Amino acid sequence: MGRTDFNPEWYGAQAKVLTSNEDQMVVDYGCNGRGIVKSYKLFDGIQLCFLDFETDESMKAQKFNPDIIQVTHCQTGRYECEFTNHTVAYLPKGYFSIAATAYLPASFSFPLGKYYGVSLVIDRQALSEETRRIMQTIPINLDKIGATLGLETRWYVSDTPPQLQHLFLELYTAVEAETTGYFKIKALELLYHMEQLTRVNGCD
């Protein structure tokens, strides 16, 4: 049985793998207090990560591949980011964000001392032809999502609409209860809604 890839550049030298198999991996982030990241490999280039933190530590952002899109939802706590231009943005409870490698924070923290959320991470350089074919049948244009939302120059943050709130709740409920196949279906559903968001923003 293979193992889900662990990229130390994404987590930092202090992180360590607790468990790993071909479908999922649990990583201890190595921060003060608690920092657990549970990731599911869904498709080549796409993974779903549940983040469970209880820490007052401010952490430097790690190095990521140059063409990543990340959809994040905050279920509990608050996620705060400082960017290289010293501006600060935060993701409060009940909100979601979409970010790209071109505009990622220099550091992040959890001002309330806790955070529980989920992130869908798309590494467009790692997408296989099979993954792209699956997306095209829906259709979902992953290249279009980043360009139309202006992710090269900003961090897109929004209150979560009811249909997305329901979807995120299903993801949280499914942890430890459902197989990776279930998360694949929900990831496609989430990406479908991101495609619709692109259209709403009038960028066709």
Feature locations, PLM:
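Short Lys/Arg-enriched alpha/beta "domain-start" segment
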Residues: 1-24
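N-terminal functional module of multi-domain proteins
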Residues: 17-116
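Alpha-helical structural motif
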Residues: 2-7, 47, 67, 160-167
